[in-house]
């Protein structure tokens, strides 16, 4: 039986885990990136409006002894994570605005958005 934990993660923490590679895409689970800008824009609009989106599934981290960090893999949610990173890196616009065009208050609300994450323990 697969063990799992459901938790809520602030979008800022998810972004930081992706940037620092504490959370990585695993080709074993993930298909190639297929979302076009329109899909990414619609998804980011969901976050900006404060609507929920489906959980992101990750596998519990393996330990990188050299870096002394735990590295988790995205099982389901690569397209969404890629869209989030692309938006905060100003790779596409939503409603004719890049992320950097948002006011400080809008950015804070975006970063505080809570993401539902299901962490799977696939080693048991």
Name these PLM-found stretches:
Residues 1-14, 23-37, 41-124:
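Basic- and aromatic-enriched surface patches that contact anionic nucleotides/nucleic acids
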């Amino acid at each position: 039986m697969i063990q799992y934990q459901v938790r809520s993660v602030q979008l800022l923490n998810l972004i930081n885990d992706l940037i620092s590679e504490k959370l990585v895409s695993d080709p074993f689970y993930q298909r190639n990136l297929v979302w076009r800008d329109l899909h990414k824009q619609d998804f980011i609009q969901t976050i900006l409006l404060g609507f929920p989106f489906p959980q992101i599934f990750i596998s519990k981290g393996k330990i990188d002894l050299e870096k002394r960090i735990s590295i988790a893999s995205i099982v389901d949610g690569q397209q969404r994570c890629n869209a989030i990173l692309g938006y905060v890196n100003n790779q596409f616009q939503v409603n004719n605005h890049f992320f950097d065009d948002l006011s400080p208050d809008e950015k804070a609300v975006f970063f505080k958005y809570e993401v539902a994450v299901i962490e799977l323990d696939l080693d048991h």
